[in-house]
């Protein structure tokens, strides 16, 4: 009860009131319907959210193409773009190099620590979104611990869905909340910061997941958090599947675990948290992923997690405050780790991984510039860059 009371206090006192909503858009003239492609198109200066709303009302055209450029919030708010049940089944796809950012220095408070961010989350997936909803081909960046909104009312989620403090605080790049199970492909989540957790992605299924959020061919790079899950956080009772993803340069534990300190127990204070954190009653299914050059690899207190044909290599990056040894995997139940290559300062922090079905201290993978291992021993394991589909990468 003390912890719940404290979290309510965080939500009420540590975040500022709503100053404006990201719904305010006046550039909808850059959104058009392409009947031949059966898709809506958004050009630079246009409103992606307006296109999503149009597609939500349109029974025949459920694709939104966003053309090359950088898309910023037009106003302070809780998300640059958001998906709810009415948006289920829409594919939002980048055409060319498309950046979605939380930053807008023209309207941000340049004296605030969060400058130049003006939204809590770059992308929000809310209650009622299934795996038929697809986000593909974007770069997601710019979150910097900006937080607005309190309580149970939110412009990006139904009043009927309960809001935890982490609804507002976590998931600077992408927040996945309640019964939301999107499919996210070829997305690069880079350069985000949040406190306490989940700077790149925060998945919060509120304890009763009916499915898993799906990530394929994604990159998580240079994300930072005050406490846990620098790149990816699976909060209590959540599920995610990650296939062919890269984690590099992510740092957790930048400061004190202020939630743990005030509620009777810091989270993994000695060795800290990894690029990916899996909390109790959660499950991660990870295959053909690479974790390298992070503050730590993975910490997993979940149930039934699997890590298959993945690479954990030298996750010893400096930057956090935990004084214990850096580690590749810290997992309470290691039976699901198999056919993986593991090497670092501490390979298996808890000694729970079966060495007979994994390779400890393998040869140097000799990563190239895209983190593809050149050593032949690694031919069947780890991340490989996905070839961009012609539909999403050509000029239209």
Task: Annotate each language-model stretch with its function.
Residues 5-23:
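N-terminal export signals
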Residues 27-35, 107-113, 117, 306-308, ...:
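Acidic, glycine- and Ser/Thr-rich low-complexity intrinsically disordered tracts
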Residues 32-67, 77, 82, 377-386:
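Acidic Gly/Asp/Thr-rich repetitive segments characteristic of extracellular carbohydrate-active
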Residues 37, 61, 68, 78, ...:
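Surface-exposed or flexible loop/turn and strand-edge residues in extracellular/cell-surface modules
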Residues 49, 53-59, 72-93, 99-136, ...:
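Extracellular beta-strand-rich solenoid/capping regions of secreted or surface-exposed proteins
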Residues 67, 96-97, 131-144, 181-193, ...:
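Right-handed parallel beta-helix
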Residues 80, 120-122, 146-147, 164, ...:
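Structural detector of coil-to-beta-strand junctions
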